[in-house]
Amino acid sequence: HGFLGYGVMSCANLEEAIKLAQRFVRLRTVLMSFKLEIEGDFAIVVASSNYPVGLLRQFIFESLLLSLTRAGSFITGNSINAGEIHFDFAEPVYYQSVKHKLPPILFNKEANQLRFPKAFLSQPLIMADPVAAKLAAEQCERELALMESSTDIPAQVRAMLSHQQGYYPQLEQVADRLFMSSRTLKRR
């Protein structure tokens, strides 16, 4: 996930990582968002959709919450079974066949969320690096500013060039950051 993934892995602890991901999730998807809440002894990552996604809704929530669970396990070293996932939809027909590979999951709940012990929030991350976390967060800020600045392609390119420090990116790099091919960028 580019600088966002690098930044998340480099944060000092899980709480910082979740807050960084929460702030910049729009760099990866505009369909979903999530927020961190505390309820008693539990930390809760509540997921929501920003747009109607129709038939993809269940798939998107499954993908997001299972990905966050696996990522959290990877960066902390905690067991994937240390928490539980809640979904607001009925148990899918395939669940029993994959249940043994997944963390505890509860269906027909009020919200789509990942729940785990609050104490995990302060746990140091395996790959914590404050310098890398700062640099990655700064790059994410630049990417977000670029994304929000305009839908006008020439304006986005100018903004991107003005944010560079000491060099100009190649055409392919600019196109990649704008999520298009170099050929499409030239036409626009």
Model regions and ranges:
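Internal, well-ordered alpha-helical segments in soluble enzyme and binding-protein domains
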Residues: 17, 64-67, 132
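Short capping loops/turns at secondary-structure boundaries
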Residues: 7-10, 14, 53-61, 78, ...
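Short, highly charged low-complexity linear segments
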Residues: 14-15, 37-39, 77-88, 123-132, ...
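DNA-contacting interfaces and partner/effector-binding or oligomerization modules
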Residues: 32-33, 37-121
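Short secondary-structure junctions and interdomain/linker hinges
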Residues: 11, 28-32, 75, 143-147, ...
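N-terminal low-complexity or simple alpha-helical regulatory segments
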Residues: 1-42
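Short hinge/gating elements
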Residues: 2-8, 50-54, 121-122, 140-143
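Extended mid-to-C-terminal alpha-helical interaction segments
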Residues: 92, 99-188
